[in-house]
């Protein structure tokens, strides 16, 4: 394998079959890296540009019958310039440049208008002070995901999110690991606009 330029590779094959025949071949062109199980498109560690604004979405109690006393939330952070439509399933206008991240986390059920300060650990467990790992893919993502408008995306499979608060301002600092081992990190300090999608959708 030889890389030439602009993502182009030269792949040379020299295959010996069981019957003694040898097959020689060569391919020149683009090679898509990854496999059917790896969902990140990142190829190296990334520090997200400092977000300029964000939302705190209350999503209500867990819909799982066997999980009680847990509420679901999403912290949604966007860099300046991104246009987002919360009332249209959080659609983002795909023009220009920008980055955003969705962090799904869990609290005790008595939190319905704010989230407590603390350390939230990325995992699959739906319990307070945990954040849901990035799952899904191929058009149906849920959990904690990083995106940019240049078609990059990455699920968080481990890491942590630290939440602090001073008056109306939250501090959200995250250090996440994607499914290729890349680190994704950044932090935000400022207000988070509250959005109650649970009571809106159930009204």
Q: What residue ranges belong to the model's regions?
A:
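Short, surface-exposed linear segments at secondary-structure transitions and domain or protein termini
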Residues: 33-39, 108-117, 194-200
């Amino acid at each position: 394998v030889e890389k030439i330029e602009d993502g182009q590779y030269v792949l040379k094959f020299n295959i010996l079959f069981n019957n003694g025949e040898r097959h020689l071949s060569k391919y020149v062109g683009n090679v898509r890296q990854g496999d059917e199980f790896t969902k990140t498109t990142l190829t190296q560690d990334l520090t997200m540009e400092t977000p300029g604004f964000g939302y705190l979405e209350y999503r209500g109690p867990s819909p799982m019958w066997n999980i009680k006393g847990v509420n679901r939330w999403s912290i949604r952070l966007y860099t300046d310039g991104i246009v987002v439509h919360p009332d249209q399933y959080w659609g983002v206008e795909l023009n220009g440049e920008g980055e955003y991240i969705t962090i799904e986390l869990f609290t005790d059920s008595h939190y319905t208008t704010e989230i407590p300060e603390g350390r939230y650990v990325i995992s699959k467990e739906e319990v307070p002070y945990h954040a849901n790992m990035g799952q899904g893919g191929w058009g149906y993502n849920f959990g904690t995901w990083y995106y940019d408008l240049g078609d990059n995306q990455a699920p968080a499979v481990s890491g942590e999110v630290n939440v602090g608060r001073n008056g109306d301002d939250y501090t959200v600092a995250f250090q996440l690991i994607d499914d290729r081992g890349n680190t994704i990190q950044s932090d935000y300090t400022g207000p988070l606009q509250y959005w109650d999608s649970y009571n809106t959708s159930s009204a």
